[in-house]
Amino acid sequence: MFLATLPIDQAVGHILRHNIVDAAGHKVLPKGKRLTDDEVTRLRGLGIAAVRVAVLEPGDVHEDEAARRLAAVVCRPGVTATEAVHSRVNLFAEADGVVEVDGAALLAINTIDGLTIATLPNHALIRRRKRVATIKIIPFALPKALVQQAERIGFEAGGVVGVRPLLPRRVGVLLVASPEARERITRLVLPAIESRVAELGSMVCAVRYVKPDEHEVAEGIAALRADGNDLLITAGETSIMDRDDVTPQGIRLAGGRIEHYGAPVEPGNLLLLAYLEDGTPQGMPIIGAPGCVRSRATNIVDLLLPRLLSGERVTRRDIIELGHGGLLER
């Protein structure tokens, strides 16, 4: 592709580089328009003798075709691409879910001059029909070799952006508190947990109370598991203060494994994540919620719960990586 200013009679088939306006300032033709005979005649009637155009050369790929081709290899399951309009394709979520972005592939494609992809943050919660990403081709055309380079990156990565749908899960809540504090803890903690879970398409199906004793915690976990719950959330009078505190000990007695304790996220530093193995790739997650779970202000639980409810097995490394952006200012 090269840029030129051509006499109007030589402009047919080339791409208009700038908007054309009439004497009153009204737009006659938009930039990016491939000029036809009729449009050239119209411009001649306005007294226009020459126009600035982009001239495509053999091997060039028009901006809209380039955007379509890139979208075809960028999309992972869970997203739908629009038609290309003005060199842009938007990707929308097919269902409520969690955004998945291959950051390395995204960086590699965006390094190619003239190609851009902007996405929501990896692991962000997304709602159905909301925009997840946008593809924009900068010039009016790209050399075929650059488009093919981007296609190879997307193909080898298995796509760049997708949405893992939220699954309707049964959630059990274990409240660890003395009998004297149960009413207060229930009032402070349970509504916030129930509303969080409901907003993500799942339901709190069982609530059990135990005293702060590791054996009672283990029995409560076993009972909630037997009730058919898919995910457990524990909360209590205080946050879990150590890997060997009462709740972690109870989780181990119940057969669980502590994945990680302590998160580089504020609010939510005193988070615990554990799993009970159940024969599935994810296992049964157990969130040991910190005290901030009582508030509906965004905290560590809001970062992890959607991912767990979409079936992801969140790891120690995943939690550690939350430190970049982990200061959640209220």
Where are these regions (language model features)?
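Structural signal for hydrophobic packing residues in well-ordered secondary-structure cores
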Residues: 47, 74-78, 95, 126, ...
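Flexible, glycine/charged-enriched surface loops at secondary-structure junctions
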Residues: 53, 79-84, 142-144, 203-207, ...
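Short, glycine/charged-enriched secondary-structure capping and boundary segments
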Residues: 43, 149, 186-189, 246-249, ...
